[in-house]
């Protein structure tokens, strides 16, 4: 059993570190199997040597954040625990505090993980950014935040949000209602992000003026989009032809962000994902950056992170079996019918 001692500069810092009902400290205790006690400004961390060392590093990182006046919430503590487990806890203080934009309710939007920070930097630096990430990493929300920031700064005149309107085998023509009714369910996540950033009234005003356009991917064909911030969401469900068509819509003064999750492809088995192909074809092309986020960047409920990690592990273990099955299956022979 090892016991380590940490001294805080002020009691107020410990209040922030411990969190409401000591929930932050309990998370650290559970994660590393240690016991943490305090008296005045002094903290004691008890456990086996490696566990006590990790617990101390986590607390010291939280104290450093508290000293800077940083807000310490559940997501930040969970992310810090992941960083400590990989020996990268120093990175938590390197997450840029730059605000991308402010929502309609006055909430600042900024990176919460190193992966998100690199993603935002890629968008700001490059004309085309491809964000490949699992669910819950904020890839679409942050892209919309960058689009709103660019529009407010008058570096673009329009925000165009699009996604494939055909998913899970459904065709628009078979769905009830007019065109708007047909596409609304597919585009709802994009509407939600814009409503959050702008508020419904401002969104409606810009939509009426043509400053904002939310449309199915098919509506991009034959157009050249100048001075626009264009986001293609759910890009894993584009075909290779759709992806090439979309990329060639780029006009002068425009910026493109493509987001998708290659583990959630809904295309028929004989169709190649345009996103997967674009990643291979465009890797290394100047002014195009491919940015990959991981389960560590998931900022939703902690269970979402576990679900994403579990599916990721399952998919990796399944690949060798699928590959072997492909070459061991006997080809089917056609019977001659008379």
Predicted regions and their residues:
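Short glycine-/aliphatic-rich beta-strand segments at the starts of folded cytosolic domains
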Residues: 1-16
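Short, surface-exposed acidic/glycine-rich loop or hinge patches that mediate macromolecular interfaces
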Residues: 11, 22, 49-50, 237, ...
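Short amphipathic alpha-helix segments
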Residues: 13-30
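Hydrophobic side chains in well-ordered alpha-helices
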Residues: 17, 24, 55-58, 243
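Compact, well-ordered interaction domains used in eukaryotic information-processing assemblies
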Residues: 26, 32-35, 41
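Interdomain "pre-motor" coupling segment immediately N-terminal to P-loop NTPase/helicase cores
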Residues: 37-96
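Conserved helicase motor core of SF1/SF2 NTP-dependent helicases
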Residues: 42, 104-116, 122-232, 236-338
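Conserved loop-to-helix interface motifs that mediate assembly, gating, or partner/ligand docking
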Residues: 86-107, 111-114
């Amino acid at each position: 059993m090892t016991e380590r001692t940490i001294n805080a500069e002020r009691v107020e810092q410990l209040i922030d570190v411990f969190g409401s009902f000591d929930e932050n400290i309990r998370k650290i205790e559970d994660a590393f199997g240690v016991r943490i006690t305090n008296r005045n400004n002094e903290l004691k961390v008890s456990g086996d040597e490696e566990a006590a060392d990790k617990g101390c590093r986590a607390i010291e990182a939280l104290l450093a954040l508290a000293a800077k006046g940083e807000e310490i919430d559940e997501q930040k503590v969970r992310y810090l625990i992941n960083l400590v487990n990989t020996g990268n806890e120093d990175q938590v203080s390197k997450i840029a505090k730059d605000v991308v934009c402010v929502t309609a309710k006055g909430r600042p939007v900024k990176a919460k993980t190193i992966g998100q920070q690199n993603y935002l930097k890629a968008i700001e630096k490059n004309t085309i950014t491809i964000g490949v990430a699992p669910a819950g990493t904020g890839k679409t929300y942050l892209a919309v935040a960058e689009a709103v920031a660019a529009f407010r700064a008058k570096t673009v005149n329009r925000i165009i949000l699009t996604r494939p309107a055909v998913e899970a085998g459904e065709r628009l023509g078979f769905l009830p209602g007019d065109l708007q009714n047909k596409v609304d369910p597919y585009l709802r996540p994009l509407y939600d992000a814009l409503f959050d950033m702008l508020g419904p009234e401002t969104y409606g005003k810009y939509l009426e003026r043509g400053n904002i356009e939310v449309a199915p991917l098919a509506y991009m064909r034959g157009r050249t989009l100048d001075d626009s911030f264009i986001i293609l969401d759910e890009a894993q469900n584009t075909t290779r032809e759709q992806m090439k068509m979309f990329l060639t819509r780029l006009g002068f003064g425009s910026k493109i962000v493509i987001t998708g999750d290659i583990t959630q492809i809904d295309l028929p088995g004989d169709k190649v994902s345009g996103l997967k192909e674009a990643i291979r074809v465009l890797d290394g092309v100047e002014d195009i950056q491919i940015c990959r986020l991981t389960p560590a960047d998931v900022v939703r409920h902690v269970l979402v992170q576990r679900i994403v990690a579990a599916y990721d592990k399952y998919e990796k273990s399944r690949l060798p079996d699928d590959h072997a099955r492909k070459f061991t299956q006997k080809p089917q022979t056609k019977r001659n019918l008379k």
